[in-house]
Design a protein with these regions (language model features):
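A conserved structural/catalytic subdomain of Rossmann-like adenosyl-cofactor enzymes
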Residues: 6, 11-13, 17-157
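Conserved SAM/SAH cofactor-binding pocket of Class I
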Residues: 1
Length: 157
């Protein structure tokens, strides 16, 4: 089933049942790149606990979207919760809070693949982008927890 809602995904998620975020088998998005003022001031009080890995910088909301997407996929190994997200290349390299969140995602063994795409792919920006694939079945206790590899694809040429 497909459910679409209009709203502010980070400040006021619309896909909820009761007081819980809805869970999905697959979540795919192309969120706004490096969104400024995404709601960092409110993240520490998030009623859904999405930012337990850390709060991304106020001026860069990329990891806020990534974290939200991961937290809305199934953890159950039989449900295969997967995430595909298009991000600016900076998401792969920036330090500080973003570096700590990225490290946590890697330590959780969630990152499955990184696909580097060329610059000028989008008409609205010339920066290179990447597709990140996360797989919840790789978590401890999951069906693919023994997989520790990450597939890197250079599709930038």
């Amino acid at each position: 089933m497909t459910r679409l809602k209009w709203g502010d995904t980070l400040r006021n998620p619309q896909l909820v049942e009761g007081d819980q975020l809805m869970r999905f088998n697959v979540v795919v998005a192309n969120p706004p790149f490096s969104l400024d003022k995404w709601g960092a001031d409110e993240a520490a009080k998030d009623p859904h606990g999405r930012f337990w890995r850390g709060i991304p910088p106020k001026s860069k909301g990329d990891y806020a979207f990534i974290t939200h997407m991961i937290e809305t996929t199934y953890v159950d190994p039989h449900e295969n919760g997967r995430v595909g997200v298009i991000v600016p290349h900076g998401v792969l390299f920036r330090g500080g809070a973003e570096g700590r969140i990225r490290q946590q995602l890697i330590e959780e063994n969630l990152l499955d693949a990184v696909v580097g795409l060329p610059a000028n792919l989008f008409t609205t920006t010339g920066i290179p982008v990447a597709i990140l694939i996360f797989d919840r079945s790789r978590e401890q206790g999951g069906a693919n927890a023994d997989r520790r590899d990450v597939l890197f694809i250079d599709a930038s040429k």
